[in-house]
Amino acid sequence: MSMNSSKQPVSPAAGLIANTTCQTENRLSVFFSIIFMTVGILSNSLAIAILMKAYQRFRQKSKASFLLLASGLVITDFFGHLINGGIAVFVYASDKDWIRFDQSNILCSIFGISMVFSGLCPLFLGSAMAIERCIGVTNPIFHSTKITSKHVKMILSGVCMFAVFVAVLPILGHRDYQIQASRTWCFYNTEHIEDWEDRFYLLFFSFLGLLALGVSFSCNAVTGVTLLRVKFRSQQHRQGRSHHLEMIIQLLAIMCVSCVCWSPFLVTMANIAINGNNSPVTCETTLFALRMATWNQILDPWVYILLRKAVLRNLYKLASRCCGVNIISLHIWELSSIKNSLKVAAISESPAAEKESQQASSEAGL
C-alpha cells in the first residue's frame, strides 16, 4: 500500500490554510497556552510530590495500590501538558504556518499521537483506580492478600501500552494524523471523512473514552454504597471513617471532573464520525470541547491536592466556625487505614471467623 500523504507532505496543511473558517487570535492564544501549560505542570508536579510521599507512608497498606495508580495518572497528565503544551506554544509562536515547519508531517503525527495517548490513558487509569477501590472495599481480604504492588505495576504498564497502541493505530494503518481546521492541533481526520476507516478511528476513540467513564461511574457507585453500608452497620469501628470519607470524596470528584470535561469532546467526535461530512459540528464547537478536555488535566491533580484528609479537616473546622456551630469531637479524623476497618468488619461476619473463635474458646476451656 502506497502512502500518498508521505509523498505529498504539503497537502494536509495547504488544504486547511485555503479553507480555514476557524481562526484564533495568536497573541492571546500564545499567552493562554503558556499559562495553561505552566499551571498544569506546576499542579501536577505538586500532586506527584504529595502522592509519592503518601505512597511511601502507605507502602505496605491497601491504600498503596490506589496511590500507585493515582501517581501514574498524574504523571501522565504532567507529560501531556509538557508535550502537548510545548507543541501548541510552538505552533502559535510560528504563526501556525505548518507548511514552513512541518513539511514532512512528522510533528503533526507526534502531536496527534500525544493527544490520543494523553486523552485515553488518564481515563483508563481512572477506571483502573475505580475497579481497584471497588475490589478493595467490597472484598478487602482478597484485595489485601492477592493484589500486590507488583500486580498493580503490571496493570499500570498494560494500560499505558494499550493507550500507546490505540494512539499509533492510524500510523500502523498508513493514515496520517491531520491538522485540524483551527490549525492549532492535530487529531484524526474530522474535516473530510473519506471512508469507514476515518469513521472507525473516531468511533473507537469515543467508545473507549465513554466506556472508561461508564466503568468508573459504575464502580464508584458500588464503592460509595458499600462504604456507607459499612459505616452505618459497623459503628463500633469508628476509627476508619476518615479514610471512608476521604475515599468517597476523591472518587466522586475524579468521576465528576472526568465526566464534565471529557463528555463533550467524546460526544463531539462520535457525532462527527456518525454524520461524516454532514455533521452539524462546527470548528468552534470542536475547539471548545477540546479546551474542556484539557481542563481535566489541570483539575485532576487538585483532587489529590485539596481533597486530602488534612485539608478537609481544616475546611470542616473553618465551616463550623463560620456557621457558628460547635465543633464536635473529631474522632472521625484519627489516623487509620480503610483496610483495617473494612477487614475487621468483613472478618467478623465471615464463617471462618466464627470457626476460629469457637476453636479459641474450646482451647481456652481445655
From Swiss-Prot:
Cytoplasmic side: 56-69, 132-152, 225-250, 308-366
Extracellular side stretches: 1-31, 91-109, 176-198, 268-285
One MF term in the entry's GO annotations: prostaglandin F receptor activity
Membrane topology summary: Multi-pass membrane protein
Residues carrying a glycan: 4, 19
Biological process (GO), any one: response to estradiol
Keyword Glycoprotein found: yes
InterPro entries given in the database record: GPCR_Rhodpsn, GPCR_Rhodpsn_7TM, PglndnF_rcpt, Prostanoid_rcpt, Prostglndn_DP_rcpt
Record localization: Cell membrane
SUPFAM superfamilies assigned: Family A G protein-coupled receptor-like
One Pfam family linked to the record: 7tm_1
CDD domains: 7tmA_FP
GO CC aspect terms: cytoplasm; extracellular region; plasma membrane
Transmembrane segments: 32-55, 70-90, 110-131, 153-175, 199-224, 251-267, 286-307
UniProt KW Signal keyword: no
Main location: membrane
Keywords, in A-Z order: Cell membrane, Disulfide bond, G-protein coupled receptor, Glycoprotein, Membrane, Receptor, Transducer, Transmembrane, Transmembrane helix
Covalent S-S links between cysteines: 108-186
Function of the molecule: Receptor for prostaglandin F2-alpha (PGF2-alpha). The activity of this receptor is mediated by G proteins which activate a phosphatidylinositol-calcium second messenger system. Initiates luteolysis in the corpus luteum.
Sequence similarity: Belongs to the G-protein coupled receptor 1 family.
Protein name: Prostaglandin F2-alpha receptor
Organism from which the protein derives: Mus musculus
Species classification: Eukaryota, Metazoa, Chordata, Craniata, Vertebrata
Name of encoding gene: Ptgfr
